[in-house]
């Protein structure tokens, strides 16, 4: 009896998905920024995969799922939503956020647990942002961080 050929490794399938649909993919994520007063700011961003451009970002001290949903409304006005939205399994991206993503007509794609390589475009942008900007500036508050990020 012949054995059926094995399916490609999950990593290869994921990479094929990213390459084949890059024009229709956006990713969202958070990263933390320490402040001068030892507080922590959370920077939320949405990035397009095709040109690696930031579609939307905002800063908050206390991210909630309701706040994330509002940011998604601002990121995708009217019919500008991508086909797929990649995000990790962070506590802020709960079932409420997943349901609202579906209501926008976007297919949510959650990455595997502790697999930052699956959201490489977003993780790369976070690394560049830290190296090029945040390693050289001490952030005072959320307004200061927003101004720095706009530049």
Outline where the language-model segments fall.
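Charged DNA-binding/catalytic regions of mobile-element recombinases
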Residues: 1-151
């Amino acid at each position: 009896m012949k054995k059926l050929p094995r399916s490609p490794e999950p990593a290869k399938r994921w990479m094929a998905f990213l390459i084949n649909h890059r024009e229709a993919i956006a990713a969202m994520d958070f990263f933390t920024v320490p402040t001068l007063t030892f507080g922590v700011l959370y920077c939320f961003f949405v990035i397009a995969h095709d040109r690696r451009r930031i579609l939307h970002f905002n800063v908050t001290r206390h991210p909630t799922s309701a706040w994330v949903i509002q940011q998604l409304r601002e990121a995708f006005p009217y019919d500008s939503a991508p086909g797929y939205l990649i995000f990790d399994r962070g506590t802020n991206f709960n079932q409420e956020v997943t349901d609202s993503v579906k209501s926008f007509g976007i297919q949510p794609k959650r990455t595997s647990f502790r697999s930052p390589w699956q959201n490489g475009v977003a993780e790369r942008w976070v690394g560049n942002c830290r190296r090029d900007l945040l390693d050289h500036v001490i952030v005072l508050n959320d307004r200061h961080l927003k101004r720095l990020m706009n530049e």
